[in-house]
Amino acid sequence: MHATSSDDFSLSSRVALVTGAGRGIGRGIALALARAGADVAVADLDPQVAEETAAAIRSLGRRSLALGVDVSDGDSVRAMVERVATEFGRLDVAVNNAGVISIRKVAELSLADWDRVMNVNARGVFLCCQAELPLMQAQRWGRIVNLSSIAGKVGLPDLAHYCASKFAVIGFSNALAKEVARDGLTVNALCPGIVGTGMWRGEDGLSGRWRQAGESEAQSWERHQASLLPQGEAQTVEDMGQLVVYLACAPHVTGQAIAVDGGFSL
């Protein structure tokens, strides 16, 4: 039996790209990859927050590059990947994390709301994968992790459009995994649960919007953890980063949609 060692989860000499890495889950994943030894390109719609993450990665002794990108725009995505290839000479791990959310009932949902969520969350994953694949296939090694959600496994009220985009990511990732399985690539979807980032926290987050009468946002946050999660506590960005590091090192895990959700989707 092979004994697990820290070397099994080393990404030394690997180059990673994380979109939506300026804050929240994307930032946590980028830092986890850097701590595992990877050099990390950090992309975000806001170049300033991307640079803040890149600076944190450099402080860990790894190389980093901050990039601005609109993942719903093909030219912007292709330019991002070309810049990574120019700066680092390769691309080994791609985490297509950039995403948006809005909270609307279907009866109130505008076509603009639908298009915005689908264009970033689903079209963006497609465009990123399409641009990343040639580099990985040329070197016959690559790991792609696309961000879905528990909302890609379970329908949630007021989030039908968001659920549609995240269900799409799972189906796309599963199909792509089969297409590239003989090329030395793996493709998986990560499905975060309830994480204390901007999607959930704050007056405009889900815990703010789903408050009961007389309840504060903080009280709503605690109630949702207690009522929705069998474990009773929220997940962290570090939880997501740990799984991505594992997937980046695992040669035979592919086509999976893995929930890190404290049992929410059971």
Language-model regions: role of each:
Residues 129, 165, 173:
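Active-site helix of classical SDR
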Residues 105-106, 113-115, 144, 210, ...:
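Substrate-binding pocket helix/loop in short-chain dehydrogenase/reductase
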Residues 126, 141, 233-260:
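C-terminal substrate-recognition "lid" of short-chain dehydrogenase/reductases
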Residues 149:
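Residue(s) in the substrate-gating loop at a strand-loop-helix junction
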Residues 134, 178-179:
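Alpha-helical segment proximal to the catalytic Tyr-Lys
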